[in-house]
A protein has these predicted regions:
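Active-site SXXK
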Residues: 12, 30-56, 83, 130-134, ...
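Active-site helix/loop module of the DD-peptidase/beta-lactamase fold
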Residues: 50-89, 109, 138-173, 177
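Active-site Gly/Thr loop motif
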Residues: 206-264
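Peripheral terminal and inter-domain segments
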Residues: 298-463
Length: 463
């Protein structure tokens, strides 16, 4: 599994902490994806504490500019609590249902398929609007609104949130911070809003937020980490509660043993449910072994330290070299018209590294890779968004890339973008005589769209 970092904490103290170095360390700013939702919940709790809102308030009352006589009745009935509990009427995210509208407006322009507050149905648009509500009431993003509390618990000043296309903090997915920053936020949650004897966030709100408010067991896919209920932007587990983010951003809370597990990663190439189940079972095994007995500073301690020091990205299943490699080294392959828009490519190979050279609609590109080892560099595109969805960053983003021969004549290139948003593309090149098959499989939200599909190619007559 492509896990970038993890930590176990007991009674607020770090018991184990590891990073997949040299690419990730304690200062790496990591996209937290839907763990962002739990942070938005804290901001809503602060609004409640300051009596700026009531959970029974109708969200439409705060956005009259988007509602009129045509607004669906089920949308008019949505309360703030319904949104926190993921029990709103639309079938899916409003910005997906109405891509023709700004994200904020779209929430109020869709039709409901069920009464508000009746059925759990995961909906990121709800959280996004809650974040916009914070901005509307206090004139700052939910991150900046929580800055006084963050300062007291030691969360870094450089924490930020990616913006939506219409310029609001993307509370459903956009928080970017270090793992240690997120740990500090989680510890505040675990302590029900208290820090050094001071009440920073309302205890009663956090008690409700981290306990079952609504049943989310609505499909034949029970899992102890996610099917025991849902709170206010927190998942209820069989042993406590949790925060989840796409790609294996997780925080598992075990209150009875005062145990916390946090990790970051990019497992978007795999089914997130599978990775989540595997991680939760692994962490649950650790939970079962946790006692009050102190670990001796002997073999056990040294073994733990060695394992955390040696923690790295997953090993490779292929090989570094094959006899066939030299036959295609530097040769040009011309591709038929394809959905990626790639006209031709070459693979250049050395002993330990190489690069994939190709031309698409934006020009000639060069993707450097290590052979059976990751190489850090820049992904050769400037049209990916960074701080705001849909707005090209204009810069090449950081990436790590590796290649391996999975068969004698089949080369797999794995590229992971590790900027303010995470994405990956697996490029498979299968050679047969003078022909080549190309497959690109990407997993990235709102970018890398033309890095997916198949292509048919032949060795160039120039070769």
């Amino acid at each position: 599994m492509n896990i970038h970092s993890f930590a176990f904490l007991r009674r607020g103290f770090v018991a184990a902490e590891a990073y997949a170095k040299p690419f990730f360390d304690e200062n790496f700013m990591h996209r937290m994806y839907s763990c962002s939702k739990s942070v938005v919940s804290l901001a809503v709790g602060k609004l409640v504490k300051e009596k700026r809102i009531r959970l029974t308030d109708k969200i439409c009352d705060y956005f009259p500019e988007y509602t009129d006589e045509n607004t669906d009745e089920s949308i008019k009935n949505i309360t703030i609590e319904d949104m926190l509990e993921m029990s709103v009427p639309p079938l899916t995210d409003a910005y997906a249902l109405r891509p023709d509208l700004p994200w904020t407006e779209s929430f109020f322009k869709v039709k409901g398929v069920k009464p508000s507050g009746t059925i759990f149905d995961y909906n990121s648009s709800s959280t996004f609007i809650l974040g916009v509500l914070v901005e509307k009431l206090v004139g700052k993003t939910f991150i900046d609104y929580l800055r006084p509390e963050f300062d007291k618990i030691g969360v870094g000043e450089n924490v930020y949130c990616v913006l939506s296309p219409d310029g609001h903090a993307w509370g459903g997915s956009g928080v970017v911070c270090t793992m240690r920053d997120f740990i500090k936020i989680c510890l505040l949650v675990a302590e029900r809003g208290k820090h050094d004897g001071e009440i920073l966030l309302p205890e009663d709100y956090l008690a409700r937020a981290t306990s079952k408010r609504v049943s989310n067991y609505t499909r034949n896919d029970y899992a102890p980490r996610k099917s025991e209920g849902y709170g206010y932007q927190f998942w209820i587990t069989d042993k406590g509660y949790s925060a989840y983010g796409m790609g294996s951003q997780y925080a598992f809370f075990f209150p009875d043993k005062d145990l916390l597990f946090v990790c970051t990663g990019d497992t978007q190439v795999a089914a997130d449910d599978f990775c989540g189940e595997f991680l939760y079972e692994w962490v649950s095994d650790v939970y079962d072994e946790v006692t009050d007995k102190k670990l001796d500073e002997g073999d056990d301690y040294e073994n733990l330290k060695r394992k955390t020091d040696e923690f790295s990205l997953p090993d490779f299943c292929g090989v570094k070299q094959t006899p066939f490699a030299e036959e295609i080294n530097g040769e040009k392959y011309i591709l038929r018209a394809n959905e990626m828009g790639i006209k031709w490519f070459r693979v250049w190979l050395n002993n330990d590294d190489g690069f994939f050279e190709y031309e698409n609609a934006r020009g000639v590109k060069r993707l450097n890779f290590g052979l059976c080892g990751y190489k850090q560099g820049k992904f050769p595109e400037t049209n990916f968004y960074s701080r705001r969805v849909g707005i090209p960053s204009g810069i090449e983003q950081d990436c790590i890339v590796a290649a391996e021969w999975t068969e004698e004549k089949k080369l797999l290139i794995r590229a992971y973008v590790i900027g303010s948003n995470f994405g990956n593309v697996f490029i498979t090149l299968g050679f047969k005589g003078d022909e080549v098959g190309v497959a690109m499989n990407k997993k990235a939200e709102f970018f890398m769209d033309d890095y997916e599909g198949f292509a048919y190619g032949c060795l160039s007559a120039e070769s």
